Amino acid sequence: MKKSIVTFAAVNALASTLSASHLTTAQSDLSVDEAVKKFEKAVASRNITVFDVIEHSKLADQAGLKMTDTTVVIVGSPKIGTLLMQCEPKIALELPLKFLFYKDGDKTVIAYEDIKNIAARYGAQECDAVSKLSGAQANLLKDMAK
């Protein structure tokens, strides 16, 4: 319990929005693989679909190249995503949403682009689904601290 509270505080303290790249990030003490597994459980508990898990570092190994542990998890909810695409069909290029997990030193960084930033690029920031999706993204990141 104490570790969960400390981890939660650390994730909240380290979560930041990078203005240049529009990424929201947090750090975890878990390995990339452990963080991805925990994230997948959090996604499943919210009835969100994991569409794909792309293990870039394993693909690099297969190509005879080396890179730090890096995985992208592609997630979404057709019930919510469809509402956003009904509002602005071109935003379909950005869906489903992606979460990035990569090793940085002895930490795992979890990063995503807030749907609010994505929607703004398409002039869809007023769509009702944007706030709901943005909240879901933030809650998934918070779930990583539990």
Question: Where is each model-derived feature located?
Answer:
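Terminal, regulation- and interaction-focused segments at domain boundaries
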Residues: 19-50, 142-143
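Positively charged n-region of N-terminal signal peptides that target proteins for export
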Residues: 1-4
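Bacterial N-terminal signal peptides
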Residues: 8-16
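Beta-strand/loop substructures that line and gate deep hydrophobic ligand-binding cavities in soluble
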Residues: 98-123
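Small-molecule pocket liners
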Residues: 22, 71, 108
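Compact, glycine-rich, soluble single-domain proteins
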Residues: 48-95, 100
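C-terminal partner/receptor-binding element of secreted or periplasmic proteins
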Residues: 116-146
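Stable alpha-helical elements in mature extracytoplasmic
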Residues: 35, 39, 56, 133-137
